[in-house]
């Protein structure tokens, strides 16, 4: 086997296959600089298909969730079509990623990507679509509940001193109401100021006295903050109360939550 290879050959192989630099170099070294044999090498290793698919948009897939020993994990695994998302190999990959994360308490998605890269590449070659380990989250707590709405929406919520029935209802509420923050006080100043500037511009068209405009803007901002904060949202199971009211009645509080929706913010 050759120990070095001409960069011109690497460039040509990349141009013909779309495979990455290192994959092309390795294939050429293993095939002693023979382009055609290197192409076959890439195909056999699965690198050719995987590299060509890497930029394909993945906005289908599934949300996976699992709880074990006071640890909850949630994963969004993407593919290109709904058909592949139902493939057993795709489902097994998602489930195995969660098992690995739970057993080793892995919090870093990049670590999971490294561990499962060869498995991902192999699956890309088999199904002919790009597969993307898009996002992952781990939470810890004494009382964790997981809720999946089909495979498209997933919620993990951690609470203290809250029975499973109420915790399930709150998880379902989170799935439906899409809160972004736990409490109004958690809303970032950046998010608040961006919305404030929008409301300020909208108010200029109302032709109202400045003191009245201030009240209008303040009212809209309060509504905005409440709408994106879990504890201030009207509880979907009992809309005359807020989620905060339900928690207070049960002498409990939510420690953390995470909500994934399939394909969120993925370019179409």
Swiss-Prot record:
GO molecular function: translation elongation factor activity
Subcellular location: Cytoplasm
Protein name per its UniProtKB record: Elongation factor Ts
Keyword line: Cytoplasm, Elongation factor, Protein biosynthesis
Protein role: Associates with the EF-Tu.GDP complex and induces the exchange of GDP to GTP. It remains bound to the aminoacyl-tRNA.EF-Tu.GTP complex up to the GTP hydrolysis stage on the ribosome.
Keyword Thylakoid included in the entry's annotation: no
Primary localization class, coarse: cytoplasm
Origin: domain of life: Bacteria
PROSITE patterns: EF_TS_1 (PS01126), EF_TS_2 (PS01127)
Signal peptide limits: none
GO CC terms of this entry: cytoplasm
Region described as Involved in Mg(2+) ion dislocation from EF-Tu: 81-84
HAMAP family in alphabetical order: EF_Ts
Pfam families per UniProt: EF_TS
Protein family per UniProt: Belongs to the EF-Ts family.
């Amino acid at each position: 086997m050759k120990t070095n290879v001409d960069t011109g050959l690497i460039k040509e192989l990349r141009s013909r296959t779309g495979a990455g630099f290192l994959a092309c170099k390795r294939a050429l070294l293993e095939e002693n600089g023979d382009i055609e044999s290197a192409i076959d090498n890439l195909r056999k290793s699965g690198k050719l298909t995987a590299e060509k698919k890497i930029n394909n948009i993945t906005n289908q897939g599934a949300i996976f969730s699992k709880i074990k020993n006071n640890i909850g994990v949630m994963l969004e695994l993407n593919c290109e079509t709904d058909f592949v998302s139902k493939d057993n190999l795709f489902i097994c990959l998602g489930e195995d990623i969660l098992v690995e994360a739970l057993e080793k308490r892995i919090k870093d998605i990049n670590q999971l990507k490294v561990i499962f890269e060869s498995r991902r590449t192999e699956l890309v070659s088999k199904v002919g679509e790009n597969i993307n380990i898009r996002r992952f989250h781990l939470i810890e707590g004494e009382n964790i509940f997981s809720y999946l709405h089909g495979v498209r929406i997933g919620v993990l919520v951690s609470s203290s001193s809250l029975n499973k029935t109420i915790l399930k209802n709150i998880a379902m509420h989170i799935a439906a109401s899409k809160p972004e923050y736990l409490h109004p006080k958690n809303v970032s100043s950046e998010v608040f100021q961006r919305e404030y500037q929008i409301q300020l511009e909208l108010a200029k068209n109302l032709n109202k006295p400045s003191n009245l405009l201030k009240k209008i803007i303040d009212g809209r901002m309060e509504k905005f903050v409440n709408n994106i904060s879990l504890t201030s949202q009207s509880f979907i199971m009992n809309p005359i109360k807020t989620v905060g009211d339900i928690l207070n009645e049960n002498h409990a509080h939510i420690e953390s939550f995470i909500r994934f929706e399939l394909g969120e913010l993925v370019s179409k």
